[in-house]
């Protein structure tokens, strides 16, 4: 097996990260995160979360390309839950088609996230239904990669959406 993707929540901002990613030959996922992991949820603030996340991801993608990482190796992740309030996460999800329109494969990771708990009132171990709803909406909006804890259930849900959308032959 081995690694097939570098998924860096810091978007290669640490010293040597560009070089390591470039030299690996792997796909690279650029993740939006406002702040740092230990403090990112303290005071997240945006004027327009979708525009700001889009601008950040495009800028980091350009930085990656300048560092010698081919555009074809890049994946973008809007970073649901990474320095965002519930309102930010919901607005960003509503704007997902715009992020897909940036021209990079989009990865969405919302499985068991706190945003599901905030909306449904469910604890982490009871968030499957909310996660499946978001996974199917993300795929329908054009997200190419869905990160999930519940692989079988998510695959089944995504296959059903694809069948309804007459894309079952591509699965």
Spell out what each predicted region is.
Residues 80:
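Active-site metal-binding loops of divalent metal-dependent hydrolases
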Residues 60-73:
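Phosphate/pyrophosphate-binding loops at sites that engage ATP/ADP/AMP, CoA/4′-phosphopantetheine
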